Swiss-Prot record:
Positions of region (Regulatory domain): 390-506
Keyword Metal-binding carried by entry: yes
Localization (cell): Cytoplasm
Source organism: Bacillus cytotoxicus (strain DSM 22905 / CIP 110041 / 391-98 / NVH 391-98)
Gene behind the chain: leuA
Protein name (record): 2-isopropylmalate synthase
Length: 506
């Protein structure tokens, strides 16, 4: 069986989704979960993009032990050296250098001739190999590149030392048959083809990213790139969880294997969704809430008689918990700690103490605490650790004519408290106005979403907000049993990130 490598770009391409702005701690959280998932290569970011990106890539590179850590770089010496400084301490550092090869990009974006492009590819890969043990070259907009020139560019990159060649469908233009044929063409037309691993990278503009990725694998690609939940700019990228499960379920056809730990898919998908604020459609393949639901009477009858009549994927395969194990207010520290370990959380004593206190507070208000509650609780605690301000007091009361008044007390990391009050057309608007007054900000709320994490009247609420000031847009989330408290936490989380961002760019 062919071994397929999985390269995840959730932290780079995925973060380019509008409104997604992960901080360093959140990126590290996702990176560690990707490591548990069995990802072979993770693109931690674009080190040369900003100091914040550089620090995030550097920290991930120093923390990950069981996957290659890669930084994106343009075909520029400064970018390549910056990428090296960021990932040089990784167990397995890798460079991803790219340059466009299509006529439209060379003419209008690069303003370069074909000869200039080939020379730039040669020089950048040579430099990369002098610094990195592994170099990946991407021919940006490969699917709209004239095939003879693409083959020439790929040959130049391999001869210069490129170990991996990526053939990206940058604008989601191709279709499965065409993409398969392109990989076959390169196999026949590139003299040094056998000296490199070929990779596919598909965007979903025409809804074919996963299908194209699978076609590329059939065509000879040994590495597949994408993101968790298919997030990314425009219509997103190939959803890696869909590719992984498709290869597993239809291994009779694809005859491949990979290092992906399928039972970690659900946990990874949920974490990425909640940290980015990009909710998963209920009907999404593999990880959607309805992926294993049956409403039709005929389907229900069939499943009850024999599950394989209408289910080709067992929920347990992807870690969809069927566990009815619950905790409650009488559960002790030992039971809580053991359950957190079973869910994959390795906590320090300080983190364990804080999480247990939060658990006991929740257990006083909620009869039964499920695994989903615990995951949400940990997500909320992680958010609190990265916030500049925490909510100490929140009070709302009715004034008149649908006007509400909110009083908010925030506390910063040094213990200083700040209090203010404001009115609004509803409780949430009043709370947000009060927080704005305290933080002296005039940001605009561009998105507000609320989701029930578990079922029942005592369910936890997960609120996601997006704030914008000028060209800068960030997201934040809050988790609490009370909707107003969750909403306030989400706003403070986002506002703190935006305030820090504005301070950096001034």
């Amino acid at each position: 069986m062919k071994q397929i490598l999985f390269m995840d770009t959730t932290l780079r391409d995925g973060e380019q989704s509008p409104g997604v702005n992960l901080n360093e701690q959140e990126k590290l959280q996702i990176a560690r979960q990707l490591e548990k998932l069995g990802i072979d290569v993770m693109e931690a970011g674009f080190a040369a993009a900003s100091e914040g990106d550089f620090q995030s890539v550097k920290r991930i590179a120093e923390s990950i032990q069981n996957a290659s850590v890669m930084s994106l770089a343009r075909a520029k010496e400064s970018d390549i050296r910056k990428a090296y400084e960021a990932v040089k301490r990784a167990v397995s550092p890798r460079l991803h250098v790219f340059l466009a090869t299509s006529d439209i990009h060379m003419k209008y974006k690069l303003c370069m001739s074909k000869e200039d492009v080939l020379d730039s590819i040669h020089r950048s890969v040579i430099l990369g190999k002098s610094l990195f043990p592994t170099v990946q070259f991407s021919a940006e907009d490969a699917t709209r590149t004239a095939q003879p020139f693409l083959a020439e560019a790929v040959e130049v990159a391999i001869r210069a030392g490129a170990d991996v060649i990526n053939i990206p469908d940058t604008v989601g233009y191709t279709h499965p048959e065409e993409y398969y044929s392109l990989f076959q063409y390169l196999q026949e037309s590139v003299p040094s083809y056998e000296k490199a691993i070929f990779s596919c990278h598909c965007h979903d503009d025409l809804g074919m990213a996963v299908a194209n990725s699978l076609a590329a694998i059939e065509g000879g690609a040994l590495q597949v790139e994408g993101t968790i939940n298919g997030i990314g700019e425009r219509a997103g990228n190939a959803a890696l969880e869909e590719v992984a499960v498709a290869l597993h379920i239809r291994k009779d056809h694809y005859k491949t294997q990979s290092s992906i730990i399928l039972k970690e898919i659900k946990a990874t998908s949920t974490l990425v969704s909640r940290l980015t604020g990009m909710m998963i459609p209920k009907n999404k393949a593999i990880v959607g809430a309805n992926a294993f639901a049956h409403e039709s009477g005929i389907h229900q009858d069939g499943v009850l008689k024999e599950v394989t009549t209408y289910e080709i994927i067992a929920p347990e395969l992807i870690g969809e918990s069927q566990n009815l194990f619950v905790l409650g207010k009488h559960s002790g520290r030992h039971a809580f700690t053991e359950r957190m370990k079973e869910l994959g959380y390795e906590l320090t004593q300080k983190e364990r103490d804080a999480a247990f206190e939060a658990f006991k507070a929740l257990a006083d208000r909620k009869k039964e605490i499920t695994d989903e509650d615990l995951r949400a609780l940990m997500l909320g605690e992680a958010a609190l650790l990265t916030q500049q301000y925490n909510i100490k007091q929140l009070q709302v009361h009715f004034v008149s004519n649908h006007i509400q008044c909110a009083t908010v007390v925030l506390q910063d990391g040094k213990g200083n408290k700040y209090e203010d009050a404001a009115t609004g057309a509803g409780s949430i608007e009043a709370i947000y106005h009060a927080i704005q007054r305290i933080l002296e900000m005039e940001c605009k709320l561009v998105d507000y979403r609320i989701q029930s994490i578990t079922q029942g009247q005592d369910a936890l609420a997960h609120v996601h907000v997006e704030l914008k000031e000028g060209p800068h847009q960030v997201s934040g989330f809050g988790v609490a049993q009370d909707v107003l408290e969750a909403s306030a936490r989400a706003y403070v989380h986002a506002a703190g990130k935006l305030k820090a961002l504005l301070t950096l760019v001034k």
